[in-house]
């Protein structure tokens, strides 16, 4: 073979690498790819590739291949060196483990070199390869590495070894939002802040083209300032061009997953970013309520609720959630087609829920967070849960026999935020040279700056020396000015005190006149009443003469005599009480009408009850259900009446508040007008002061500069010529400067005087404007008064017409009253007869109660004997029937009474309506008169106030004149003192004198202007006086029209008075009848409540007795089985063999089983845990005891019918996925019909304030503590239950909505009636039970399965279809905290 010549080029090599432009550009592109951290072939990826190849090939079986062995021999040592130089886990000290998941854990670490604290996430390569889920970490790494967003947790570096992937992240010491929600009750203000931050964080993720898909409080971390950042991006997915995602698996946490993501499980996975907004809605609901909206104990239950979200989403009644918050949650938790945020984040930002005064969407990150974590050090981990050490062995890859490539999926994972590799490239060198040039230029600039600063410092020193000289002169002037100011302040204080006294005097005089006017008015009223009394006396005498012999006349005389006594008593009282009585009369008539309507409703309902009782005599249970429905109706009617009363009182309060607000608004309007004028004055003063100060500063600066230059020039010349006389010259210069300063002060004072004069001119202008405005207001008032006079004349004409109509109405009323009296007497007799009947029935009832007590005594004595107990139960049933018959008789009597009362009430209603019309007309006349009088008094008060204001203006004017005189005198004195000092500066003195003359001329001009202004002021005062006189004339005219009487015939007046008297008499009779009626109603209501309480107590006693019976049955059954066992033992030949077949392996017979089991407290094991019960299973019943002592006393807590059992089975993780994993093998479930359960009434303790559910159970009620700020009454004692500012503690039942004082419960008073609303009892229930071990669980399940009846239990004749046939199982739910389980398909 021929060799190539030595000088020749290699074949295929580039001809000139340095000279070829195309080759250089390709190399630059290649370098750019290697330097780019996002490139798949960057430096770290290439090193990872080499490292992973060596790790995957370095096994004995693979080294047999010669090529692999040569490769390893070549690169094995260098790869080990690379590993030593790269970052590794040993570079960090582990402080604490703060999280653990399926793929690894999160550690709090400190970097050894920099001593900085980080959170380091470890992911096991073996676990990811084993679960075929090694792709999720790429999205998480890329988002945290390249997001550069304040809403995303930052990744500082990522590295790996043969077992783990490591991600060193920003440490968030505030913990997650789960920790925050467990430590605090989150108010709506906080929820608003954190929801806004989550919205912005998700918007940042969406803007990167990704969907998070696992938004939950566990993935929301808080930094040291309390602000939120998102974490855990393992479930993130890239959106396509249309903003959608295709996925065939449901990804996310069950409680927060959206319906469209759930549907993707079946292969229909096509959804967008709106799935994240669903999770935000769930998160907001959880913050405000304390639980997720679709919580269920099983996964199936949770998913079914999410799919049926339209029906299953509901807000608890006891949670305080605003309308805007509810609206936002509903907008998020809806179908994806209409979900809020589908069209962009802007529509979420514009929602009214986020409106507040503290932050906006741009500065929320800069504002203070609601909770800032208190940290003791940089490694404080108090906001994270303590995690136990993982003692299990770490699994690793097995030694392969062929090439597997376990490390290949992780090539390119390594990342450094501050990458120092390839930093010495040519581009870097160019950057360095540019930096050196910049540094040189900056040094030159700094030198120039230094020289300029030195020059500045010398200039400043010279300026400071001059300022010190000025200060010494200013201090003297300030002392004199202070003394003057003190004297002026004293004088002003004395004058203001005098003005205040004058104002108080004028107001007292006005009040005195007002009281005198009211006294005259009262005297007139008294005279009118005396006239009425005299007329009544005359009528009495006439009646005595006409009807001396008849009995009817004597009754009327007595009534008239009573009326006379009442009117004499009324004369002694004040007129104000009469007006109040009329108002209260109108209000009471309205209340009576309402009570009467209530009584009618109650009568109708009583009729319905009677018919229902007659129909349902066959069965006691059916009778109870009808009674319950009637009670519900009755409570509903009483609630409506209470609501109406509350509304009426609320409206009255609103009227009063409206009037108060009107007066306040008028006062504020006046104050604002005064304030506006004051502000205008201040504005003018400020503008003048500012202009003057600017001028003074400019002039002083110019003068100082000129003087400085002149002094410098003089000093230079004199230093050259006169070196020997420097000291003398310097002293002379100082004196000259002093004199100059004194002259400047004089100049400034003159200019100050000018400014003050200008200020006064502007103040006078403002006063002029004010007075003009007042004149305009007075003219407007005059027009308004004229219109009022016209309106009043029209009203008077209308009132005369109304009087004629009322006279006709009164005639008709007198006829109707006579007929009513007759019917009333008959009704009273019938009512007395019925009351006697009722008393006899009550006596019979008491006798029956005694008999029941005797029967109870017999029951206690005969508890040991079964036959006696059965006999007692039959006896009890007969007593119940007898009580029913008595109840029916009572209801018949009540019905007859109520029918008669209703007829009376209809007649009274018509009379009351007519009376109200007449009273309202009289009230309107009195109101019109009182309004006119009040207007007159207000006008007089305004007059006095304006006179006082004019006096104050005059006083101020005088004060200003005196101040001007004093300033002129002081100026003249200073001028005289200064003339002696300014002898050497004659030229400057002449100039100053000229300026002083000009100033004096200006002062004289100002004085002339002031005189002219005073003249104008006097003219305006005259105009004011004329307007006032016109106003008083108009008021007098109005009073004249009001007091004018129209000529009316005397006969009509007497008829009117007579009818008014009769009207009053009838009204008094009505009032007494109504009082009697209300007393009877209260009495009947109390009796009803007592009956209801008695029925409730008796039903509870019956349940308890039945439970004790069941327990006794089980004891008897046990004794019988023992007896049988003994008989069998005696009959058998082998004495030592024992019962044998009769007993099971565990020592109990097949028909009996007992032991300790745990029940969930309030059906929520996560929040309240379990409670132990002693359980006995007999042939017919399952009995639950609180303790073995209760078992001995036959006092069970709960009893279940074995006939009503449907199903018994061990649970799975999906059934109780919130329970502890260790407890699941020991839990089993019983499914039974609700009618087969009998249970003791439990009084749960009131929960603390921190918890959301504070329900108190009592007599079937579910009371919730509350406060009422609007009118409401207690339905137990009928006393007020509200107050505007400090309402008393109250309770409201969330079933029947009855309201009462909390004191009745605390004092254990028996006033509260039992609840009238009960839940449906014919629905299936499930019960979870926890055994002590898995063996016990299996034993209980196997035994109970044998007990289940083969045929379904016969349904109750009056109940609905059994749940066993419908297979609809209602799962009990309660308030709980959702479990925080780490998802199995991603790290925590």
UniProtKB/Swiss-Prot annotation:
Q: Which positions fall inside the REM-1 domain?
A: 497-573
The active site consists of 214 (proton acceptor)
Which residues form the Phorbol-ester/DAG-type zinc fingers?
1260-1315
What Pfam family does this protein match (any one)?
Answer: PH_MRCK
The Protein kinase domain covers: 92-354
Q: Which GO terms describe its biological process?
A: actin cytoskeleton organization; aortic valve morphogenesis; cellular response to transforming growth factor beta stimulus; negative regulation of biomineral tissue development; positive regulation of centrosome duplication; positive regulation of protein localization to nucleus; regulation of actin cytoskeleton organization; regulation of circadian rhythm
> Which residue positions hold the site described Cleavage?
1131-1132
Fetch the Gene3D superfamilies from UniProt: 1.20.5.340, 3.30.60.20, Phosphorylase Kinase, domain 1, Pleckstrin-homology domain (PH domain)/Phosphotyrosine-binding domain (PTB), Single helix bin, Transferase(Phosphotransferase) domain 1
Tell me the InterPro entries matching this sequence: AGC-kinase_C, C1-like_sf, HR1_rho-bd, Kinase-like_dom_sf, PE/DAG-bd, PH-like_dom_sf, PH_domain, Prot_kinase_dom
The terms describing its cellular component in GO are:
centrosome; cytoplasm; nucleus; plasma membrane
Spell out the Basic and acidic residues composition-biased ranges: 512-530
Named cofactor requirement(s): Mg(2+)
Reaction catalyzed: L-seryl-[protein] + ATP = O-phospho-L-seryl-[protein] + ADP + H(+); L-threonyl-[protein] + ATP = O-phospho-L-threonyl-[protein] + ADP + H(+)
Query: Which residue stretches belong to region Disordered?
Result: 1-24, 512-532, 1345-1388
Q: Where is the composition biased (Polar residues)?
A: 1362-1376
Stretches the record annotates as Interaction with NPM1: 373-420
The record comments on the domains as follows:
An interaction between Thr-414 and Asp-48 is essential for kinase activity and dimerization.
Q: How does it assemble?
A: Homodimer. Interacts with IRS1. Interacts with RAF1. Interacts with RHOA (activated by GTP), RHOB and RHOC. Interacts with PPP1R12A. Interacts with EP300. Interacts with CHORDC1. Interacts with BRCA2. Interacts with NPM1; this interaction enhances ROCK2 activity. Interacts with SORL1. Interacts with PJVK.
Stated name of the protein: Rho-associated protein kinase 2
What organism is recorded for this protein? Answer: Sus scrofa
């Amino acid at each position: 073979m021929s060799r190539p010549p030595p000088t020749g080029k290699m074949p295929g090599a580039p001809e000139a690498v340095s000279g070829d432009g195309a080759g250089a550009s390709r190399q630059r592109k290649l370098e750019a790819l290697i330097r780019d951290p996002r490139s798949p072939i960057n430096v770290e990826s290439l090193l990872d590739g080499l490292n992973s190849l060596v790790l995957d090939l370095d096994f004995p079986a693979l080294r047999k291949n010669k090529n692999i062995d040569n490769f390893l021999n070549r690169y094995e040592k260098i790869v080990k060196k690379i590993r030593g130089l790269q970052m590794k886990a040993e570079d960090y000290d582990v402080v604490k483990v703060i999280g653990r998941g399926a793929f690894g854990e999160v550690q709090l670490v400190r970097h050894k070199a920099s001593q900085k604290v980080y959170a380091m996430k470890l992911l096991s390569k073996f676990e990811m390869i084993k679960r075929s889920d090694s792709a999720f970490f790429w999205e998480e790494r890329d988002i945290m590495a390249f997001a550069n967003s304040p809403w995303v947790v930052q990744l500082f570096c990522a590295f790996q070894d043969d077992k783990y992937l490591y991600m060193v992240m920003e440490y968030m010491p505030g913990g997650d939002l789960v920790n925050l929600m467990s430590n605090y009750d989150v108010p709506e203000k906080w929820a608003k802040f954190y929801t806004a931050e989550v919205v912005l964080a998700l918007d940042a993720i969406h803007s990167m083209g990704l969907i998070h898909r696992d938004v939950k409080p566990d993935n929301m971390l808080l930094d040291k300032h309390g602000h939120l950042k998102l974490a855990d991006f393992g479930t993130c997915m890239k959106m396509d061009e249309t903003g959608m995602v295709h996925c065939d698996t449901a990804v996310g946490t069950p409680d927060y997953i959206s319906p469209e993501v759930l549907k993707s499980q079946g292969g229909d996975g096509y959804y967008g970013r709106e799935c994240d907004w669903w999770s935000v809605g769930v998160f907001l609901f959880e913050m405000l309520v304390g639980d997720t909206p679709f919580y269920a104990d099983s996964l199936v239950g949770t998913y079914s609720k999410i799919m049926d979200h339209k029906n299953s989403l509901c807000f608890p009644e006891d949670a305080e959630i605003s309308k805007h918050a509810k609206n936002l949650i509903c907008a998020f938790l809806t179908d994806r087609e209409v979900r809020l945020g589908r069209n962009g984040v802007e529509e979420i930002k514009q929602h009214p829920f986020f409106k507040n005064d503290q932050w906006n969407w741009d500065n929320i990150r800069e504002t203070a967070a609601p909770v800032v974590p208190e940290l003791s050090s940089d490694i404080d981990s108090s906001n994270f849960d303590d995690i136990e050490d993982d003692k299990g062995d770490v699994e690793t890859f097995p030694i392969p026999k062929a090439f597997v490539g376990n490390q290949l999926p992780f090539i390119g994972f390594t990342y450094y935020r501050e990458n120092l590799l390839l930093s010495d490239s040519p581009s870097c060198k160019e950057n360095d040279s540019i930096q050196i040039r910049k540094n040189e230029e900056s040094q030159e600039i700094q030198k120039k700056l230094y020289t300029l600063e030195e020059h500045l410092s010398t200039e400043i020193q010279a300026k400071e020396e001059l300022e010190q000289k000025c200060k010494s002169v200013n201090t003297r002037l300030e002392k004199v000015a202070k003394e003057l100011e003190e004297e002026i302040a004293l004088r002003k204080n004395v004058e203001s005190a005098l003005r205040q006294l004058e104002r108080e005097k004028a107001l007292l005089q006005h009040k005195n006149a007002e009281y005198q006017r009211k006294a005259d008015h009262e005297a007139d009223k008294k005279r009118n009443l005396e006239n009425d009394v005299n007329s009544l006396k005359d009528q009495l005498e006439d009646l005595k003469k006409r009807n001396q012999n008849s009995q009817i006349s004597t009754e009327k005389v007595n009534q008239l005599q009573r009326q006379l006594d009442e009117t004499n008593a009324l004369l002694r009282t004040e007129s104000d009480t009469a007006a109040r009585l009329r108002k209260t009369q109108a209000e009471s008539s309205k209340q009576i009408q309402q009570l009467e309507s209530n009584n009618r409703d109650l009568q109708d309902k009583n009729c319905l009850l009677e018919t229902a009782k007659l129909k349902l005599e066959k069965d006691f249970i059916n009778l109870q259900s009808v009674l319950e429905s009637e009670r519900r109706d009755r409570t509903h009617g009483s609630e409506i009446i209470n609501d109406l009363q509350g509304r009426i009182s609320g409206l009255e309060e609103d009227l009063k508040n409206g009037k108060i607000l009107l007066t306040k608004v008028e006062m504020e309007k006046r104050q604002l007008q005064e304030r506006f004028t004051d502000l205008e004055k201040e504005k003018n003063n400020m503008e003048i002061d500012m202009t003057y100060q600017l001028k003074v500063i400019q002039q002083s600066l110019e003068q100082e500069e000129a003087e400085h230059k002149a002094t410098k020039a003089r000093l230079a010349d004199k230093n050259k010529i006169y070196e020997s006389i420097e000291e003398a010259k310097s002293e002379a210069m100082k004196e000259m400067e002093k004199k100059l300063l004194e002259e400047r002060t004089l100049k400034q004072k003159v200019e100050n005087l000018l400014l003050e004069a200008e200020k006064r001119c502007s103040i006078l202008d403002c006063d002029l404007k004010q007075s003009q405005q007042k004149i305009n207001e007075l003219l407007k008032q005059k027009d308004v008064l004229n219109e009022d006079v016209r309106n009043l004349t029209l009203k008077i004409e209308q009132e005369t017409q109304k009087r004629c109509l009322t006279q006709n109405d009164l005639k008709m009323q007198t006829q109707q009253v006579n007929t009513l009296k007759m019917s009333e007497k008959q009704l009273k007799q019938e009512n007395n007869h019925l009351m006697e009947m009722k008393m006899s029935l009550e006596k019979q009832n008491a006798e029956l109660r005694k008999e029941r007590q005797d029967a109870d005594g017999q029951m206690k004595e005969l508890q040991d004997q079964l036959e006696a107990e059965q006999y007692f139960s039959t006896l009890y049933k007969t007593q119940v029937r007898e009580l029913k018959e008595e109840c029916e008789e009572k209801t018949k009597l009540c019905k007859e009474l109520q029918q008669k009362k209703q007829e009376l009430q209809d007649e009274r209603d018509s009379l009351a309506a007519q009376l109200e019309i007449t009273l309202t007309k009289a009230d309107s006349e009195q109101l019109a008169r009182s309004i006119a009088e009040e207007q007159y008094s207000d006008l007089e008060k305004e007059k006095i106030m304006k006179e006082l204001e004019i006096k104050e203006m005059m006083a101020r004017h005088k004060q200003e004149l005196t101040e001007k005189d004093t300033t002129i005198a002081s100026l003249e004195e200073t001028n005289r003192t200064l003339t002696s000092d300014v002898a050497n500066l004659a030229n400057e003195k002449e100039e100053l004198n000229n300026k002083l003359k000009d100033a004096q001329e200006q002062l004289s001009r100002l004085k002339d202007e002031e005189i002219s202004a005073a003249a104008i002021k006097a003219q305006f005062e005259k105009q004011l006086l004329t307007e006032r006189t016109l106003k008083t004339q108009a008021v007098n005219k109005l009073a004249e029209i009001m007091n004018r009487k129209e000529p009316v015939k005397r006969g009509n007046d007497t008829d009117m008075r007579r009818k008014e008297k009769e009207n009053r008499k009838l009204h008094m009779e009505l009032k007494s009848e109504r009082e009697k009626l209300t007393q009877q109603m209260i009495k009947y209501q109390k009796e009803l409540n007592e009956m209801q309480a008695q029925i409730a107590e008796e039903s509870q006693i019956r349940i308890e007795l039945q439970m004790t019976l069941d327990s006794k049955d089980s004891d008897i059954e046990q004794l019988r089985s023992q007896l049988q066992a003994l008989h069998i033992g005696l009959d058998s030949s082998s004495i030592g063999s024992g019962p044998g077949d009769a007993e099971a392996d565990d020592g109990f017979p097949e028909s009996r089983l007992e032991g300790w089991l745990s029940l969930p407290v309030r059906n929520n094991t996560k929040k309240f845990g379990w409670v132990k019960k002693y359980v006995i299973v007999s042939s017919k019943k399952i009995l639950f005891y609180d303790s073995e002592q209760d078992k001995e006393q036959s006092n069970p807590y709960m009893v279940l019918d074995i006939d009503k059992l449907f199903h018994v089975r061990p649970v799975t993780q999906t059934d109780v996925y919130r329970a502890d994993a260790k407890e699941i093998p020991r839990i089993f479930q019983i499914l039974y019909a609700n009618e087969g359960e009998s249970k003791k009434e439990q009084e749960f303790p009131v929960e603390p304030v921190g918890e959301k559910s504070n329900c108190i159970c009592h007599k079937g009620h579910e009371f919730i503590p509350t406060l009422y700020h609007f009118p409401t009454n207690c339905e137990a004692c009928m006393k007020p239950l509200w107050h505007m500012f400090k309402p008393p503690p109250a309770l409201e039942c969330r079933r029947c909505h009855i309201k009462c004082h909390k004191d009745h419960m605390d004092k254990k008073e028996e006033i509260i009636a039992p609840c009238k609303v009960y839940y449906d009892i014919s629905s299936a229930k499930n019960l979870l039970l926890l055994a002590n071990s898995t063996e016990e669980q299996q034993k209980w399940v196997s035994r109970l399965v044998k007990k289940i009846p083969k045929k379904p239990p016969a349904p109750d004749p009056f109940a609905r279809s059994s749940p066993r046939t419908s297979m609809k199982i209602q799962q009990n739910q309660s308030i709980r905290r959702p479990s925080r389980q780490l998802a199995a398909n991603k790290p925590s």
